[in-house]
Amino acid sequence: MHATAIAEEAVSAPRQSTIFDIDNPGFREDFDEKPFEFKHCFTADHPMFQLPRIRKVFDDPRVMHHAYYDHGAIPVDMQWVNLPERKMTSKEVFDNIETAQGWMMLRHLEKDPEYNELLEQCLDEVKRLTGRKIDGDKKSQEAIIFFSSPNRNTAYHIDRECNFLMQVGGLKQMNVFDRNDRDVTPEAELESFWSKDNNAGKYKPQFQDRAYVFEMRPGTGVHIPVNSPHWLRTYDQVSISFSISYQYKDTRRKHVYQANYYLRKLGVNPTPPGRSAVLDNTKRAIVSTGFAGKNLVKKLKGK
């Protein structure tokens, strides 16, 4: 499902009084349900996304403590635990990003006051455009810059965050799958993901044609709902992306999947979340009070 055609130049920005395009119905209709494309006002000309300003982050231990990077050829289906051994430092990858085959994630930029101001501005506008009371739902919020070499994949994965990814420099293709498609993401994968394994999501090339495919360029962004599997690739330019995201404070989804994980390990075929409010509430109560394994099965069977 191709969302846009590729363009070599940045799209026209939204009205200057806003960060996002205020007339986009996706914010209100599809927020945290379906991926959608939007426009934004950030490009590489913005002072916070120029390379010297980003490079300053490397001198901030509050941010660099959470930074992650890798380099080398990465196939779409590679698990994060199997990534190539790093032979360059983060600064070396950044300074040689055009040739390093690198991918860098500068996390928790909100610890830098200037980036935190951008994050707050973005989330305030998201609240207004979606009509959602995000502050009451969120556990945490985060700003991230992604920095990628030309012709580089980011492997298929699932995130716990509700995310708005904005392309700032270069071109990038985003492939997002419907989180409710159980051919793409079986219940067992989600159970494992929420219980113990960040690498639980497995890419299945036979279902690639079900992806929402977005061709991102400076001034465009993609909303990625929680649990929506995705993978990315860059083209012939260095790619810079800015992400704003938050995690839900509500643990209901997590606890039901964790309960089902234990049930499946014990040979039970568990009822997926959302099918029975009674079962879901029972599972949440049991997991939240520390029951697991056989105790969980006995409790759910009424023994």
Please describe what each predicted stretch is:
Residues 2-124, 262-268, 291-303:
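Transition-metal
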Residues 153, 157-163, 189, 209-210:
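A short beta-loop-beta micro-motif enriched in histidine and acidic residues
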Residues 167-223, 228-229:
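Double-stranded beta-helix
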Residues 187, 236-252:
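A short hydrophobic beta-strand segment most commonly corresponding to one strand
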Residues 206-208, 254-289:
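Active-site-adjacent segment of 2-oxoglutarate/Fe(II) JmjC oxygenases
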